[in-house]
Amino acid sequence: MIQELKADLNGKGQKHCVIVSRFNEFITENLLKGALESFRMHGVREEDVTVVRVPGAYEMPVVVAKVAASKKYNSIVCLGAVIRGATAHFDFVAGESAKIGSIGVQHSIPVVFGVLTTDTIEQAIERAGTKAGNKGAEAAATAVEMVNLLSLL
């Protein structure tokens, strides 16, 4: 018989670190609000969530590495908004910030990528709590589930 592992969304007793970009703060604050509400809804106590603010998405990898190495948290959630402009800056920042996943693999900790990469401000707004839901809330729920899944392995 095939064994299937399925994690629940009960975050009781979990500790999470949320790293949030100050750049495009009008978007990232809504992502953060969504994440914090999602953690609360899934049983994570407010005092078990630490928020770290970084200047932008480009600065996230070094902070993720430091937090992961500390072994203080069960997961790391990264929130930001990189919006395409007329230069190659978008591609560079989006590419660098996407490297955070490898840090999670190195440290065996879930690192959830909640950094929006959109073509327009409107798309970012939609993903930060309007038409397309709140990707910050989704990232927090993913973190809770991944912590539980890893505990089953």
Swiss-Prot record:
Which residues does the annotation say bind 5-amino-6-(D-ribitylamino)uracil?
A: 23, 57-59, 81-83, 113
Metabolic or biological pathway, per its Swiss-Prot or TrEMBL entry: Cofactor biosynthesis; riboflavin biosynthesis; riboflavin from 2-hydroxy-3-oxobutyl phosphate and 5-amino-6-(D-ribitylamino)uracil: step 1/2
Q: Which Pfam families match?
A: DMRL_synthase
As recorded in UniProt, its EC number(s) are 2.5.1.78
Asked whether the keyword Transferase is assigned, the reply is yes
Any idea which UniProt keywords this protein has?
A: Riboflavin biosynthesis, Transferase
CDD domains, per this entry? Lumazine_synthase-I (cd09209)
> So what does this thing catalyse?
(2S)-2-hydroxy-3-oxobutyl phosphate + 5-amino-6-(D-ribitylamino)uracil = 6,7-dimethyl-8-(1-D-ribityl)lumazine + phosphate + 2 H2O + H(+)
PANTHER family xref list: 6,7-DIMETHYL-8-RIBITYLLUMAZINE SYNTHASE, 6,7-DIMETHYL-8-RIBITYLLUMAZINE SYNTHASE DMRL SYNTHASE LUMAZINE SYNTHASE
> Which HAMAP family does the UniProt record give?
Lumazine_synth
Protein name (record): 6,7-dimethyl-8-ribityllumazine synthase
Q: Which organism is it from?
A: Leptospira borgpetersenii serovar Hardjo-bovis (strain JB197)
